[in-house]
Amino acid sequence: MARLMGVDLPRDKRMEIALTYIYGVGRTRSQEILEATGISRDQRTKDLTDDQVSQLRDYIEGNLKVEGDLRREVQADIRRKIEIGCYQGLRHRRGLPVRGQRTKTNARTRKGPKRTIAGKKKAR
């Protein structure tokens, strides 16, 4: 099992897919990495040589921000927006959607479970 950037890559998947298990690497970025290192997209993780694994590791460490570094940068960006008091920072602080989505209905992922409040009872 190949281990890159602290992530165990699945053995039986194609490299194009296996690299997406690293936080910050999607399909497109995965294809760019493989093209730059000269490794086939269709090669399986279990068939990688140690040389190829070290080549991948060197390329990713040298050119990309992934895993912990990327997570820290995203958190720092959110903290900065909260501190400067911009609209996006206020939305983050209140736990509401940041990018203009509606909140009258939906937005349950950000707002959490519904809190039932006592309302008017129906007249019979």
UniProtKB/Swiss-Prot annotation:
It holds the Pfam family Ribosomal_S13. The keyword Ribosomal protein applies. Coiled coil: none annotated. One of its GO terms (cellular component) is cytosol. It comes from the Bacteria. SUPFAM superfamilies: S13-like H2TH domain. InterPro entries: Rbsml_uS13_C, Ribosomal_uS13, Ribosomal_uS13-like_H2TH, Ribosomal_uS13_bac-type, Ribosomal_uS13_CS. GO terms for biological process: translation. One of its GO terms (molecular function) is tRNA binding. Keywords: Ribonucleoprotein, Ribosomal protein, RNA-binding, rRNA-binding, tRNA-binding. Residues 97-124 are annotated as: Disordered. NCBIfam families: uS13_bact. Part of the 30S ribosomal subunit. Forms a loose heterodimer with protein S19. Forms two bridges to the 50S subunit in the 70S ribosome. Located at the top of the head of the 30S subunit, it contacts several helices of the 16S rRNA. In the 70S ribosome it contacts the 23S rRNA (bridge B1a) and protein L5 of the 50S subunit (bridge B1b), connecting the 2 subunits; these bridges are implicated in subunit movement. Contacts the tRNAs in the A and P-sites. Belongs to the universal ribosomal protein uS13 family. This is Small ribosomal subunit protein uS13. It comes from Mycolicibacterium gilvum (strain PYR-GCK).
